[in-house]
């Protein structure tokens, strides 16, 4: 029989949607010649805020 290990929920990944501005947006970022621009059109399902649907793509 293998030994049991205890998993703590507070360690590592914490589920939930974070505010976009706090996690991805960096206003002081300066573009480089090697950067690639990608555009996505997102249509949220009924009842889903547009910002949350956009975060799912990010």
From Swiss-Prot:
Listed GO MF terms: monooxygenase activity; ribulose-bisphosphate carboxylase activity
Superkingdom of the organism of origin: Eukaryota
Family annotation (InterPro entries): RuBisCO, RuBisCO_lsu_fd_N, RuBisCO_lsu_N_sf
Disulfide bonds: none
Pfam families named among the record's database cross-references: RuBisCO_large_N
Keywords per UniProt: Acetylation, Calvin cycle, Carbon dioxide fixation, Chloroplast, Lyase, Methylation, Monooxygenase, Oxidoreductase, Photorespiration, Photosynthesis, Plastid
GO biological process terms on file: photorespiration; reductive pentose-phosphate cycle
Propeptide: 1-2
EC number, as in UniProt: 4.1.1.39
N-acetylproline, modified sites: 3
Chain positions found as N6,N6,N6-trimethyllysine: 14
Keyword hit for Metal-binding: no
Localization in the cell: Plastid, Chloroplast
Reactions that this protein is recorded to catalyse: 2 (2R)-3-phosphoglycerate + 2 H(+) = D-ribulose 1,5-bisphosphate + CO2 + H2O; D-ribulose 1,5-bisphosphate + O2 = 2-phosphoglycolate + (2R)-3-phosphoglycerate + 2 H(+)
Enzyme class, first EC level, given as a word: lyase
Family: Belongs to the RuBisCO large chain family. Type I subfamily.
Subunit structure: Heterohexadecamer of 8 large chains and 8 small chains.
Purpose of the protein: RuBisCO catalyzes two reactions: the carboxylation of D-ribulose 1,5-bisphosphate, the primary event in carbon dioxide fixation, as well as the oxidative fragmentation of the pentose substrate in the photorespiration process. Both reactions occur simultaneously and in competition at the same active site.
PANTHER family: RIBULOSE BISPHOSPHATE CARBOXYLASE, RIBULOSE BISPHOSPHATE CARBOXYLASE LARGE CHAIN
Miscellaneous information on this protein: The basic functional RuBisCO is composed of a large chain homodimer in a 'head-to-tail' conformation. In form I RuBisCO this homodimer is arranged in a barrel-like tetramer with the small subunits forming a tetrameric 'cap' on each end of the 'barrel'.
Name the record gives this protein: Ribulose bisphosphate carboxylase large chain
């Amino acid at each position: 029989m293998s030994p049991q290990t205890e998993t703590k929920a507070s360690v590592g990944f914490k589920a939930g949607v974070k505010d976009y501005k706090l996690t991805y947006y960096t206003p002081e970022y300066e573009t480089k010649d090697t950067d690639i621009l990608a555009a996505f059109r997102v249509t949220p399902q009924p009842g889903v805020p547009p910002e949350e649907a956009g975060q799912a793509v990010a």
